Design a protein with these regions (language model features):
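Active-site pocket-lining/capping segments in soluble small-molecule metabolic enzymes
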Residues: 1-58, 76, 80-167, 174-641
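Conserved nucleotide-cofactor-binding alpha/beta core module
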Residues: 61-62
Length: 641
């Protein structure tokens, strides 16, 4: 069950109640982003396994190891991980889950404040308004410049399996049941074929199935398989692209003749794309690919010769998908009505039995009820998961001359159905087995405090300044800044080495929130060479909290601390301070006082709204490789507006 939102202090009691209900319902695990919620689960609900949400932005082996030590049994890695990063994370021993199909966030996982700052709807609270699907301008180009294609790793499943991935995640939020059926079935069949040694990548029919159910400008293989920039983006259309069906040959008398590239069936949903997009549903005989179909146009539709036609939904595909819908559960019912005794109804699914009782049955003063009257009310199971497959599955034992109110019969039926559902759930919970073995409690380097610096650099008069021009360091210090935090513009080993060599002593270094395992290793090697002159490190990912460091560290905004549970969890790490979460109001920040660690509050400067792992400028220019020698970001104005 997903519980992967950041939680305010005054919401903790409600979250605890929700976790209790989740636990009692027999759930196996919860997916969590908030460190405070994770700590609460470990302490109060040890039977629930902890899965780290992709919103935690864990992107390398160090991040996976942090999660393992905290007590997470599975990590849903950030979508920006490469296959090499995935392999390295698997080696930590924690189960690894990766996104394999569906919508992608434009921003780095868990590092988007755009929706929150632009419209008050936080993506970290499950309320993203998807501003990245809106139109932006860059130079002379306007369009959905931040919108990404949907991910599809169907062909790459053997590589993921070979890397040791334990679970695949399909992004299906707000999608139809048919979408879930088609995509889940495709990946299930592929995994079974891989296990049997019969999988064949490049299956055009399977790709057609996936494209038809939903795609944005086709698919991307994502960061996992090295897609860059233009290979990630879908700038022309943010909704369903559909599949190309054909082109309009001629228009006459309210009809359009279309030459078909694909077969067309009655009930297919189409979109004619010319000067505007026009939606319609085809009604008529099926037409094979290569044939000509006649479309009846509405009076308001302006269609021209040469307009393209896309099929948005395939009626036959949807019909096949609906066959995957859960089948109703066959039940039997037995009712007993006796004057002066309570109404009674028994219902059974063959394993569980439930009983409902109603008011005492009275003698009829006028019209008496018949067994058929009772049957009509008791067999109404249409909006429930249950089914009376045969008439004889409902037996009624009743005396003559009784009065049976319709409302009482309906209430009796509803009560019986609810109790059977509860009995089935209880049986599931009982079968859930023993409490899962708890992982090791997170201890972190504080288990032995001998190498942990004492005292925090943050005090009542601390003025911290983050800067990216090494030449400014002395001037900032002269003007009263007493905590200087350097944020390199380029985080290559060579650039970082040169920057740190030119900085005065005592400067702190801000680590990027997203570093591949290799880049992280290179950076830490440079940091180690300058350890005696650096003041400390500002960490921008929860996964960095467990790095093997001896320098002092402060948790930045990339380690969201939004409640006192999270703050207490942070005190068990090396952090000597933290940064207040920028989405919270003053009253929400005060709610976690008194702070158990010194804190920083951002007072001035441009708030980073989105951290991107691709370049919109390169995407606009159609570039999808060769980043090594690119200098676009150092030339001119590169901001989208």
């Amino acid at each position: 069950v997903t519980v992967n939102t950041l939680v305010k202090q005054d919401e903790l009691s409600s979250v605890r109640e929700a976790l209790d209900a989740i636990c009692r319902a027999g759930a196996d695990a919860v997916i969590v982003q908030d460190l405070g919620v994770a700590a609460m689960v470990r302490r109060d609900f040890p039977s629930l396994a902890l899965h780290a949400s992709t919103q935690m932005a864990l992107c390398n082996a160090s991040g996976a190891d942090f999660a393992r030590r905290f007590g997470f049994s599975r990590v849903v890695l950030a979508r920006e991980c490469s296959l090499d990063d995935i392999r390295a994370a698997v080696q930590t021993g924690v189960e690894i889950e990766v996104f394999a199909h569906g919508a992608l966030c434009s921003a780095v996982s868990g590092r988007c404040l755009m929706s929150s700052m632009a419209g008050g709807r936080s993506g970290n609270r499950g309320r993203c308004a998807q501003p990245c699907r809106q139109a932006f301008r860059l130079d002379d180009r306007r369009g959905a410049l931040l919108s990404l294609r949907d991910l599809c790793l169907w062909d790459d499943l053997p590589a993921l399996c070979g890397a040791g991935v334990r679970s695949l995640k399909i992004e299906g939020r707000l999608k139809s049941a048919e979408y879930v059926a088609v995509v889940a079935s495709a990946y299930r069949r592929a995994l079974d074929a891989i296990a049997a040694g019969t999988f064949r990548p490049g299956d055009s029919a399977m790709r057609e199935e996936l494209l038809q159910i939903f795609n944005r400008g086709g698919f991307t293989r994502g960061h996992v398989m090295g897609a860059q920039d233009a290979a990630l983006c879908a700038m022309e259309r943010v909704g369903h692209e559909g599949v190309a069906l054909g082109k309009v040959l001629r228009v006459k008398g309210g009809f359009a003749a279309v030459r078909l590239e694909r077969a067309l069936a009655d009930g297919d949903s189409l979109q004619i794309r010319g000067s505007q997009d026009l939606d319609m549903r085809y009604s008529g005989h099926s037409v094979e690919a290569g044939g000509t179909a006649t479309l009846r146009l509405r009076p308001d539709m302006r269609v021209c010769e040469g307009d393209s036609v896309a099929r948005l939904s395939d009626a036959l595909q949807l019909e096949r998908a609906r066959a995957h819908a859960p089948k109703p559960i066959s039940v039997s019912m037995r009712a007993r009505f006796e004057a002066g005794a309570p109404m009674r109804l028994f219902i059974s699914d063959g394993q569980s039995v439930a009983e409902a009782s109603g008011p005492s049955v009275e003698r009829a003063q006028t019209r008496q009820a018949t067994p058929e009257d009772a049957r009509r009310q008791l067999e109404k199971l249409g909006d429930t998961p249950f089914l009376l497959a045969r008439p004889e599955d409902l037996s009624i034992d009743m005396q003559d001359g009784l009065f049976l109110p319709v409302s009482a019969l309906n209430a009796l039926r509803r009560q019986a159905v609810e109790r059977l559902a509860e009995a089935r759930i209880s049986a599931f919970a009982a079968r859930a087995g023993e409490t899962p073995a708890r992982g090791p409690e997170f201890a972190g380097p504080l288990a032995d405090g001998s190498d942990v610096p004492s005292g925090s650099p943050i005090g009542a008069q601390t003025l911290a300044v983050v800067f990216s021009d090494a030449a400014l360091a002395d001037g900032l210090k002269a003007r009263g800044a007493n905590l200087l935090i350097y944020e390199p513009r380029f985080f290559t080993p060579e650039a970082l080495e040169a920057d740190l060599a030119s900085l005065p002593g005592g400067i702190w270094l801000r680590l990027p929130p997203q570093l591949t395992e290799r880049a992280l290793g290179d950076a830490l090697a440079v940091v180690a060479r300058h350890e005696k002159t650096l003041g400390g490190l500002l960490l921008e990912s929860a996964g960095q909290l467990a790095l093997p460091l001896t320098l002092p560290v402060i948790a930045g905004e990339g380690v969201p601390i939004t409640n006192r549970e999270g703050l207490r969890a942070l005190t068990r790490t090396r952090a000597l301070g933290f940064t207040l979460w920028p989405e919270w109001t003053k009253s929400e920040q005060r709610a976690i006082m008194p702070f158990e660690l010194p804190c920083l509050l951002t007072m001035y400067g441009r708030q980073t709204l989105m951290l991107l792992n691709h370049c919109p400028k390169r995407a606009v220019d159609g570039l999808s490789g060769g980043r090594g020698g690119c200098g676009l970001c150092t030339n001119g104005r590169m901001a989208c507006g």
